[in-house]
A protein has these predicted regions:
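Metal-dependent nuclease catalytic cores that hydrolyze phosphodiester bonds in DNA/RNA
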Residues: 1-111
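Intrinsic disorder/low-complexity segments enriched in polar/small residues
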Residues: 12, 122, 233-235
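Acidic-enriched, low-complexity/disordered segments with a strong bias for Aspartate over Glutamate
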Residues: 16, 20, 25, 57-59, ...
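Short linear sequence elements within intrinsically disordered, low-complexity coil regions
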Residues: 53, 156, 212, 223-226
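Short, charged low-complexity intrinsically disordered segments located at boundaries
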Residues: 78-85, 185-194, 231-236
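Mg2+/Mn2+-dependent nuclease catalytic core
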Residues: 91, 98-218
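Glycine- and charge-rich intrinsically disordered segments
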Residues: 217-236
Length: 236
C-alpha cells in the first residue's frame, strides 16, 4: 500500500513510534486498504458463507461461485472429500455455524460460532472444524487452539432468539481441525490442533483477565493514603 501511495511513507517518517501511535495506526490502515488488503479480507470472509453451501451441494456451489473464488472453493471441497468430513446432524439440526456457549473458571463465559461440527476421517465422535483464509495458523497456533478449544468444550447451543438453549452435542475435546485455505491460492490443507493444550491456555487467559480487572488487590495500602499516578488511577 505504501508502495502505491508514497505519501503514506512520507507522512509516517517523522512520527514517533510511541507518542504518535494513533496517527501511525491510521496510516497503517490506509496502506492496508491501498494495497488491497481490505478487499482480500472481505473476500476471505465471504468464503465462510460459501462453505455451508459447499457441504450441501459441491458441484452446484462451484457453478454459482464468483470466478475469483472457484479455485479456493474447489480446493476446500477436495479437502472435505479427501478427509471424509461430514457435517454432524441431529434431529432437526445440521451443525453448521451453531452459536455455542462455554463455561469458564471464575464464573466467566465464552461464546462463538465454529464453522461446523463434523465427523472427520470416519471418527464417530464429531469434532470442531473451522475455516481460516489468512495466514498459516501454525505460525501462531495458541490463539486458534484456544478458540477451537472453547468451541469444543461448549455445553450449550442457541439457534434463535425465540428458542431456548439446548445441550451441545458430545464433541472431541482432544483435537480440532482448521481448514486452511489462504484466499487466492487455490489450496486447502487440514491442520490438526491440540485442544487439550488450548483448553489449558484458555483457563490461564481467563484467570489473567480476571486478575487484571481487580488491580486494587495487588496494592498494600498504608494507613495514610498515597498519591496515585494517572496511570494507576486509570487501572483502578
Amino acid at each position: 500500500g505504501a508502495g502505491r501511495l508514497p505519501s503514506l511513507a512520507a507522512q509516517a517518517a517523522p512520527l514517533d513510534p510511541t507518542g504518535d501511535r494513533s496517527e501511525l495506526d491510521g496510516l497503517a490502515e490506509a496502506a492496508f486498504q491501498a494495497g488491497g488488503g481490505g478487499e482480500k479480507a472481505g473476500l476471505g470472509t465471504s468464503m465462510h458463507s460459501w462453505l455451508e453451501r459447499l457441504t450441501l451441494d459441491p458441484d452446484g456451489t462451484l457453478s454459482k461461485a464468483p470466478e475469483n473464488a472457484v479455485a479456493d472453493l474447489a480446493a476446500i471441497a477436495q479437502c472435505l472429500s479427501d478427509n471424509n468430513i461430514q457435517v454432524y446432524e441431529t434431529p432437526g439440526r445440521r451443525w453448521v455455524e451453531p452459536f455455542v456457549i462455554t463455561p469458564l473458571p471464575a464464573a466467566q463465559w465464552a461464546a462463538g460460532s465454529p464453522d461446523m461440527i463434523a465427523n472427520v476421517q470416519g471418527c464417530e465422535t464429531p469434532a470442531i472444524v473451522d475455516l481460516k483464509t489468512g495466514r498459516d495458523p501454525r505460525q501462531a497456533p495458541m490463539s486458534p487452539a484456544i478458540q477451537l478449544a472453547v468451541y469444543a468444550y461448549a455445553e450449550w447451543a442457541w439457534w434463535a432468539k425465540d428458542e431456548p438453549l439446548e445441550a451441545a452435542p458430545e464433541k472431541r475435546e482432544d483435537v480440532g481441525y482448521i481448514l486452511h485455505a489462504p484466499f487466492g491460492t487455490g489450496t486447502c490443507e487440514l491442520i490438526e490442533l491440540n485442544l487439550e493444550e488450548g483448553w489449558q491456555a484458555a483457563w490461564l487467559a481467563t484467570y489473567v483477565r480476571v486478575a487484571r480487572r481487580d488491580m486494587k488487590r495487588f496494592y498494600t495500602f498504608p494507613e495514610e493514603p498515597i498519591e496515585l499516578t494517572d496511570f494507576q488511577k486509570q487501572m483502578l
